[in-house]
Design a protein with these regions (language model features):
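Extracellular "complement/coagulation-type" protease architecture
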Residues: 1-263
């Protein structure tokens, strides 16, 4: 049975970024991204296979992560890295179990969501560098006044061959479902589009499985609204990134339950 999690952590979605030291290098990763400050996105982690970046993921609790199902089309032995920005503190953890959504389609990328259980919980000493993101209830809506940011260690363009050492962030806007379908056609209710018309800010290779986090006006908590899923290339005009819509999946109902270990 699946372990039940609770997303109602009092600390979820509240990053505690450390003061910025010096100026930004101006490196642009993710597409059109800028360097994050250490502790700014404490739920973002990277997944590595054979020493190389494989995908991103988000922290849900001390021993569970959420990512994209397409990252695990072949179950692999994965290591998890939590990388901070400037000081580059690294914590490595092993994945014990991968739970891919039972309806995931490798052809359409529908239900592109997976849960990862760590072999050992995060040590409390890592706080505040490691904190959970909040999961949205099914009634949660995002408006134009929300701030939405995609983060990751992926490439800056389709041709790029060098990964950044600093976590990148890029602010994007959510498109209506009608506009999303105009761009791609085969868009299910479990998907959403986000980006900018010029394509100047987007996710790219290596960002898959990572978070699209949105914050309500007034500096409230950050919620995991989307998971980087697919798109037509990276940073192309009028072709936004496509994300798994977290609120439209029954995994959310499981994750919002009272914490209960059923192993």
């Amino acid at each position: 049975q699946l372990t039940y999690l609770c997303s109602a952590f009092s600390a979820c979605g509240h990053p505690s970024p450390l003061p910025r030291v010096g100026s930004s290098t101006g490196f642009e990763r993710i597409v059109g991204g800028v360097n994050s400050v250490e502790g700014e996105w404490p739920w973002q982690v990277s997944l590595h296979f054979s020493g190389s970046l494989y995908c991103g993921a988000s922290v849900l609790s001390s021993d569970w992560l959420i990512s994209a199902a397409h990252c695990f089309s072949k179950q692999r032995s994965l290591l998890l890295h939590s990388n901070s920005s400037f000081i580059y503190v690294k914590y490595v953890a092993e994945i014990q179990r991968i739970v891919v959504h039972e309806y995931y389609s490798a052809q359409t990328f529908d239900y592109d969501i997976a849960l990862l259980q760590l072999k050992k919980p995060w040590p409390p000493s890592l706080s505040p560098l490691v904190q959970p993101v909040c999961l949205p209830p099914t009634s949660h809506t995002v408006t134009d006044s929300h701030r939405c940011v995609v983060t990751g260690w992926g490439y800056r363009s389709e041709e790029d061959k060098v990964l950044p050492s600093v976590l990148q962030k890029a602010e994007v806007s959510l498109l209506s479902q009608t506009e999303c379908k105009k761009r791609y056609g085969l868009i299910s209710p479990r998907m959403l589009c986000a980006g900018v018309p010029s394509g100047a800010r987007d996710a790219c290779r290596g960002d898959s499985g990572g978070p699209l986090s949105c914050q309500a006006p007034g500096g409230g908590r950050w919620f995991l609204i989307g998971i980087v899923s697919w798109g037509s290339g990276c940073g192309r005009p009028n072709l936004p990134g496509v994300y798994t819509r977290v609120t439209n999946l029954f995994f959310t109902d499981l994750l919002l339950c009272t914490h209960k270990n059923n192993n």
